[in-house]
Amino acid sequence: MIPRPCRLCGGPLSPRPVIELKGMPKAAQHFPLETEFGVDQGIALTIRQCEGCALVQLDGEPVSYFKDVITAASLSEKSRSYRLAQMRDFAVKFQLTGKSVLDVGAAKGEMLEVLTEAGFGPTGLEASSESVAIGKSAGRNMAQGFIGEGVEVPGSPFEAFISLNYLEHLPEPGVAIRRISALTTPDAAGFVTVPNLEYLLATRCFYEFVADHLSYFTKKT
């Protein structure tokens, strides 16, 4: 089977896979019900590298819910403290205190409260209308829409943006990055977290290779 083109640059993927994993779950969310165990089957994950831009990626289609993937149910006390320290450092380093910030892939908007405490004026962008409704009911400044579809966000252009464990789920990360650029000022600063391929391989964290994750990044990519 001919590999699909690179989801970032459109170049050819390596004929030889970087990693092949068999018997893997079909998705990291929406697990089968007990009544479905008898017919549920694992899938093979084929990971290849682009011969052009070097991005390592899943050679396959995205899961059906990629627009509103949920990376965590909620922020634990420890996670919240960790993120708050990061956001405070981000604000100080780039002189962003009091500035507007867009959280891309905000889920229910829990990070907006962290961003507010860190001194930002935050807005959360989320594709799931259900998550947006929950966020708004908690008093959070939420906008509904998917970053890959040219959505307009009230309050743009923003002076900063964050995207936490979201870009790796998108079938066209380059489109999302260009759209983020269109929604932010020319000198905007960004804070992005994505899977670190070098770390995953060094620590043998193969559980991070799931159908939901379409891209695996290095410092170069």
What residue ranges belong to the model's regions?
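Conserved SAM-binding loop
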Residues: R88-R204, L214-T221
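N-terminal juxtadomain amphipathic helix
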Residues: M1-K78
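Short Gly/Pro-enriched turn/cap motifs at secondary-structure boundaries
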Residues: F37-Q41, C205, L214
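Fe-S ferredoxin-like electron-transfer domains
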Residues: L45-A118, T123
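A generic "functional-site adjacency" signal
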Residues: P3, A44-I47, L84, S129, ...
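Conserved histidines in hydrophobic membrane contexts and catalytic metal-binding motifs
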Residues: E208
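Short, conserved clusters of charged catalytic residues that mark active-site
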Residues: M1, A85, V175
